[in-house]
Structure formats: structure tokens, C-alpha cells
């Protein structure tokens, strides 16, 4: 009885209600049996009718009595407590519907993200290995007087030296025109025109390439005041893709001790876009994929690939 009070249910009335339901079902069954059997064989028609009506009324009174008793017991049973502890079964409603869970799309996105992370981690590892930043206990024990001091001379190169390097690179590639300007002091900005394919704005800091912006050959690269526009992107998706690949190339071609080699290597890689709309993809052999030509160029072989085919 204590448990019944705790949950708010009268178990004795509940048990009596179950027996009452069984009695009600039996009463209803007798009513239908009476209708099924009909009038029994008697001596006269009137006697048969009186017997049938009497039995049918008795059965209906029995059904009515059982139904009233069931209603009375249902009021005594009570309602279960709303604070009934469900424990872990109360968490079943929080489970997602498997048919509506975007499991495949989430796994595919995670797989692509993992591949890109592995690719960029490999690039970062190669760059760190080129920097030669290894330190050992022997090097830490060397006296500071005997250590060779490396002067950061490459950070402040004379403008004449930078002009000579750019001029030599300009003569190396006849189909490429390089215009050098210094609108903001000593830092140089290059406007590279590659045939009739594209234009590239190269922002330099001394002899180090800071950023690049690739635009179409027919696009305007100047602002309203006549200066090179180093901020706005191209209006075409194909050249936006090439801009992203050029930024990746800047991270690949890193050699702080020889910045002129870096600039020459980058210009050699950039020159491979002279056949941007003519070279097919080396992986699938198609010229267009999703409406775009092969925008990726391999850093070593300079072969053309679609962005999705290079992985």
C-alpha cells in the first residue's frame, strides 16, 4: 500500500477493475449469444416472444450493472504520479531518428576535411624541414662568441638589386610582361601580364612575395585614382581558383636564404598558365569539369589538373 501511495494508484481498486472488465465482457457475450440464438421452441408464438424479451432484458441489465461498477472502480483507481522516475528509459525520446540523420553527408565531409588536413600538414612539414630549425644539446653548449651571427641582409635589399632580378626574369619569359612600380615607397608591386590569358598583381616586401591576385585579361586592375587594385578579387570563378592556388604556391616555394630563386621558381610556375584554357586534365583527360578548366598546376612537373582530380 505504501508503494501504491507513492505512485498515486490504488492497486486494490485496480485489481477489482480488471475482474469487472472480465465480467463486462462475459455479459456482452451473453447479449450477443441471446441475439444469435433467437427465440427458443415453445408451445406458442407469444410464449417464445415473452421468453426472448425477458432473457434479453436480463442480459442488458447485467451489462449496465457491470458498466456502472467499472466506472465506479475507475474513479477509485486514481492517476499515476507525474514525478515517477524513469531513469535511463526517459532518455529514449532523445535518440535521433536514423532515417533523418545525415550520417553519410557528415562522414563524407569529415573524410574530405581529413584529406585536406593531411595534405596541408605535409606541406607544412616540408616547409619546416627546409628551415633547418633543429637544435641539439651540443649546439646549446657552444659559446655565444663562437657562434656565427647571421645578418638579415635579405630583408633590406637595395631597390636596384630587386630591379635587376625582375628584369632578368622578364627576359627569361618572352610571353610574359612584368611591370614594376613602387607606389608606397621601397616595396614593389608587379603587374604580370601572361599573354592574353590573365593578369597577376604581385605585392612584394623587398624580394619576398607577400600576396598575389589573379584576374582575367580583360578585367580592370586599376582603381579610380589610377593605382593598382591589390584588394578586390576577380569577377570570374576560374581566376579566383587560380588566386587560391597561387597563394598555396607561395607557401610551397620558400627559401629565405635565396629569395631570388623563390621569385624565379614562382614565375616559372605562373608561366604554366599560358595554356589555362587549352591544356586538358592529366588525370581525367577532360577540358572542363563543373564548368571550369584545369586550374591546378603541379609544383614540380607543372602538369595541369582539375581541383578535384589532383587528390
Swiss-Prot record:
Keywords: Activator, Nucleus, Transcription, Transcription regulation. Its main location: nucleus. GO terms for biological process: regulation of transcription by RNA polymerase II. The keyword Repressor does not apply. One of its GO terms (molecular function) is transcription coactivator activity. It holds the Pfam family Med27. It is found in: Nucleus. InterPro entries: Mediator_Med27. GO terms for cellular component: mediator complex. Component of the Mediator complex. Belongs to the Mediator complex subunit 27 family. Component of the Mediator complex, a coactivator involved in the regulated transcription of nearly all RNA polymerase II-dependent genes. Mediator functions as a bridge to convey information from gene-specific regulatory proteins to the basal RNA polymerase II transcription machinery. Mediator is recruited to promoters by direct interactions with regulatory proteins and serves as a scaffold for the assembly of a functional preinitiation complex with RNA polymerase II and the general transcription factors. This is Mediator of RNA polymerase II transcription subunit 27-B. It comes from Xenopus laevis. The gene is med27-b.
